[in-house]
């Protein structure tokens, strides 16, 4: 309330955002998103809907205004006979501005689960960290780690509650459970897909081109590492919004290991020299 008063907010908005009494049933915490518990609540102050807010920004009374966020990345994950390979670039952009070249776009949920970031970094980090909390609570309640399928379904259910509210997220959930290696794609609308190979981001089309020419389920670990390197390297070469270093992880039966962090410019130079 004090902050709203300092900012000169209208009195009506101050009342709408007032903190309820302790006895009130309204909550300010995000709650738990377990399958059998109450509906989720996001920890944001009550106020106008995002769509109404964006409409107020329109010029000359323009309606249905939509703020487009420009972002780019290249993330890749694929299953093979020895587990799951996850390879990502590290460039973060704000429009045409390169804000960072050292962002780790792999979120380590627990020793047997990994998540990737594609879209708005804040959305991906928030929801996957919340997923990590719920996976930890599941382990404490049940004495065993959550399955890859259940973890991806939990993330899908969480973001589905906020579809149409301009979230921007395309994540892959990778892990190993009793059924073996698992790989799922989840986006901001709650879409959930299972598959052997996914690539997301502005450089994904280039990564798919390399993957389609060399992917086989029977690859050895070293062959899989090299395929992941080439896919991300050539994607960053053609996509100006991707670059930096390649962070590569290998999900094994006993948990994930980080394989390497390699500069894409060095790899591209090596590949070009080898082709001459």
Swiss-Prot record:
Residues 1-72 form a propeptide. The keyword Nucleus applies. Autocleaved. The resulting N-terminal Thr residue of the mature subunit is responsible for the nucleophile proteolytic activity. GO terms for cellular component: cytosol; nucleus; proteasome core complex; proteasome core complex, beta-subunit complex; spermatoproteasome complex. It is an enzyme of class 3 (hydrolase). This is Proteasome subunit beta type-8. Keywords: Cytoplasm, Differentiation, Hydrolase, Immunity, Nucleus, Protease, Proteasome, Threonine protease, Zymogen. GO terms for biological process: fat cell differentiation; immune system process; proteasome-mediated ubiquitin-dependent protein catabolic process. GO terms for molecular function: endopeptidase activity; threonine-type endopeptidase activity. Induction: Up-regulated by interferon gamma (at protein level). Gene3D superfamilies: Glutamine Phosphoribosylpyrophosphate, subunit 1, domain 1 (3.60.20.10). InterPro entries: Ntn_hydrolases_N, Pept_T1A_subB, Proteasome_bsu_CS, Proteasome_sua/b, Proteasome_suB-type. It is found in: Cytoplasm; Nucleus.
């Amino acid at each position: 309330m004090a902050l709203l008063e300092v900012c000169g907010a209208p009195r009506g908005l101050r009342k709408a955002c007032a903190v309820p009494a302790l006895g009130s049933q309204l909550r300010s915490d995000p709650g738990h998103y377990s399958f059998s518990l109450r509906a989720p609540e996001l920890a944001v102050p009550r106020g106008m809907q995002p769509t109404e807010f964006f409409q107020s920004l329109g010029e000359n009374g323009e309606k249905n205004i939509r703020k487009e966020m420009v972002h780019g990345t290249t993330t890749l994950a694929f299953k093979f006979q020895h587990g799951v390979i996850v390879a990502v670039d590290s460039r973060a952009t704000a429009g045409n501005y390169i804000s960072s070249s050292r962002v780790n776009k792999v979120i380590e949920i627990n020793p047997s689960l990994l998540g990737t970031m594609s879209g708005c970094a804040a959305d991906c980090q928030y929801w996957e960290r919340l997923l990590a909390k719920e996976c930890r609570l599941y382990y404490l309640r049940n004495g065993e780690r959550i399955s890859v399928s259940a973890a991806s379904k939990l993330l899908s259910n969480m973001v589905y509650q906020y579809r149409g509210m301009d979230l921007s997220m395309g994540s892959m959930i990778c892990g190993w459970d009793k059924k073996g290696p698992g790989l799922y794609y989840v986006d901001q609308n709650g879409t959930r897909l299972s598959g052997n190979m996914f690539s997301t981001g502005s450089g994904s089309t280039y990564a798919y081109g390399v993957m389609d020419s060399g992917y086989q389920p029977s690859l050895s670990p070293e062959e899989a590492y090299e395929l992941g390197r080439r896919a991300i390297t050539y994607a960053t070469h053609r996509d100006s919004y991707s670059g930096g270093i390649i962070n590569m992880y290998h999900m094994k039966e006993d948990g994930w290991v980080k394989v390497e962090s390699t500069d894409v410019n060095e790899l591209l130079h090596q590949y070009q020299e080898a082709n001459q």
